[in-house]
A protein has these predicted regions:
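Active-site bordering "gate/hinge" segments
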Residues: 1-135
Length: 135
């Protein structure tokens, strides 16, 4: 296991693939979608995905030293599309880390949704950059 200098584990040795049933993964994504849509009526499309990885690493050196590490990884990605006056813009958010799916609490989902919706709204309000020759 990856350990800090004081000997404590850097992250839990959990299998994120088995930490949440498929139906619960779908429910988590649906909660995220509802949060994003509720933040602004201009949000017309929400796309979210979950990804996880579980690696078990074993190293055997030629001097006989053995080492192992269990590395869980989860990631949630969110993209929203907002529309105003026929113009569409997108925003994205998300995150993750070496945890299981319990990391994605309602507060974390709210943060990701806020990030993506805010980015889309800023893009909707953006004006084109001035064009022309530079002097």
């Amino acid at each position: 296991m990856a350990r800090r200098a004081d000997g404590r584990q850097l992250y839990p040795a959990v299998d994120p693939l088995a930490s949440l049933a498929d139906a619960d993964k779908v429910a988590l994504l649906e909660r995220l979608e509802k949060k994003a849509r509720a933040m602004d009526p201009r949000v017309i499309q929400v796309m979210a995905s979950l990804a996880s990885e579980y690696e078990v690493i074993f190293v055997a050196r030629s001097d006989g030293h053995l080492a192992a590490d269990v590395r869980p990884l989860v990631r949630l990605s969110l993209q929203v599309i907002a529309e105003q006056n026929g113009r569409r813009e997108q925003g994205s958010g998300g995150g993750g880390g070496r945890f299981d799916y319990s990391y994605f609490t309602d507060d974390i989902l709210e943060k990701y949704a806020r990030q993506a919706v805010h980015q889309a709204m800023v893009n909707l309000d953006a004006r084109p950059a001035p064009a022309g020759s530079m002097t």
